[in-house]
A protein has these predicted regions:
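Active-site glycine- and acidic-residue-rich loops that bind
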Residues: 133-136, 197-213, 227, 309-312
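His/Asp/Glu-enriched, well-ordered alpha-helical/loop segment
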Residues: 252, 270-274, 316-395
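Glycine-enriched alpha-helix->loop->beta-strand junction motifs that scaffold or abut catalytic
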Residues: 149-152, 215-222, 273-276, 293-302, ...
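Hydrophobic faces of well-ordered beta-strands that scaffold small-molecule active sites
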Residues: 75-77, 131-133, 153-157, 194-198, ...
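Alpha-helical scaffold segments that flank or form the walls of functional sites
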Residues: 69-70, 87-151, 172-189
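N-terminal metal-binding scaffold of metallo-dependent hydrolase/deaminase domains
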Residues: 1-57, 375
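Active-site gating loops and adjacent loop-to-helix segments of metal-dependent hydrolytic enzymes
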Residues: 85-115, 157, 230-275
Length: 397
């Protein structure tokens, strides 16, 4: 059965270049359908057109949403929903080392159903349709909470640590990298939404990261990794010293750990982790050399600006990324390091602090995220055949 909704404006985001180069029109405001209509069958978009064209083509009555602007539904490219119960429990503003020390004692506690429901409800109400979720301990609970709101999510099983079966013998298998909790997921989720992500270069065996990336590449899944998030990371990797080194030595690093003596981005390149299907999360402390490496490899950067500010790790060089032509997406990160999971607030932060125009922000929130996660056949634009999901552009944009 066909239905239709009508809005004062529709921004389909269809046919727009996802490149961030200034000569690509990335900064320009996207094309607008004034007085537009979306025809749908409840699950799939059937048509997107002006009300005038709709009136001539269909006999349906369109539900009028009023003086609003519709955009494609938003894509949250980085989250940790299994930490939804940590809201307000970590220390902000004193740097990464202090933050992780304050959050770790709470991470052992399983996420509650109420916390998950509240987090997913907030994302649904603010226009998010898909979430790239880093997980390991509660994949089934997260998947059920997300699908209950008719949203979708990638479940990224996080590869963490140095102790893996057969790693010393050089025969580590990809299957060894998945948490045993993967078995709890329904087959549909395993086939469609399950992937691997590396925690970070400092916290994970390089051999395990390479195997994880190879698995993602061979299964045509994207690979995600926290990269260059804070200064302690680069000090550990380049010199093997610092407070962060001492912190990790108590919990994670093997006794024979030797730093690669490379910054995070060059080291990721050295390991073969960077390409068009890699999502590098944070990238706060990137030099021009780092930016060039990311651009040349085709790596997408996922910005989590409010999380970075709240923890106190610094601010990513967003303008430099844009000028270099990097594809940028947005994520909220978790409620352990953010006040909410509203992607519009991430966009507001970039607008207010970097003067990034609405057109560029909309691309980060929609089509760029869909491209990075490999779901442009379902989301990213308001187009015929895509899933019927939309967001309402806030009035201050």
């Amino acid at each position: 059965m066909l239905n239709a909704i009508r809005a004062r404006r529709i921004l389909p985001m269809e046919g727009h270049n996802t490149s961030s180069r200034t000569d690509s029109g990335y900064y320009s405001f996207p094309d607008v359908i004034e007085d537009g209509v979306i025809v749908h069958n409840s699950s799939t978009i059937v048509d997107v057109l002006s009300f005038n064209a709709f009136s001539k083509k269909y006999t349906l009555k369109a539900e009028d949403l009023g003086d609003v602007t519709l955009t494609p539904a938003l894509i949250n490219c980085h989250n940790h929903l299994e930490l939804a119960h940590l809201k307000g429990k970590a220390t902000f503003g004193e740097g990464f080392e202090t933050w992780i020390d304050s959050a770790l004692p709470h991470m052992a506690t399983p996420v509650t159903a109420l916390s998950l429901e509240s987090a997913v409800s907030e994302m649904a109400k603010t226009g998010t349709a898909h979430i790239a979720d880093v997980n390991g301990r509660a994949p089934k609970a997260v998947y059920d909470a997300v699908t209950a709101y008719n949203l979708s999510c990638h479940i990224q099983f996080e590869v963490f640590g140095y102790n893996f079966p057969n790693i010393a013998a050089g025969t580590l298998c990809p299957e060894d990298l998945f948490s045993s909790t993967a078995a709890t997921l329904p087959n549909e989720a395993k086939k469609r939404w399950m992937t691997l992500s590396g925690h970070a270069l400092y916290s994970t065996s390089p051999d395990a990261l390479v195997v994880a990336k190879q698995w993602c590449r061979s299964h045509e899944r994207y690979f995600s990794i926290h990269l260059s998030e804070h200064l302690g990371e680069d000090e550990l990797l380049t010199k093997g010293t610092g407070r962060f080194r001492e912190q990790l030595s108590r919990r994670v690093l093997p006794k024979d750990f030797t730093p690669p003596k490379m910054r995070a981005v060059p080291y990721a390149k050295h390991l073969g982790l960077l390409d068009e299907s890699t999502l590098a999360v944070h990238c706060v402390h990137c030099t021009q050399e780092d930016i060039n490496i990311l651009q040349e490899s085709g790596t997408t950067v996922c910005l989590c600006p409010r999380s970075n500010e709240l923890i106190g790790v610094g601010t990513a060089p967003v303008r430099n990324f844009l000028e270099a032509g990097l594809q940028l997406t947005l994520g909220t990160d978790s409620l352990a390091s953010n006040h909410d999971l509203n992607l519009w607030n991430e966009a507001r932060y970039l607008r207010d602090n970097f003067d990034i125009p609405t057109g560029a922000l909309l691309r980060m929130l929609t089509i760029a995220g869909a491209k990075a996660l490999g779901i442009t056949n379902e989301l990213g634009t308001l187009s015929k055949g895509k899933r019927f999901h939309y967001a309402i552009l806030p009035e201050d944009f």
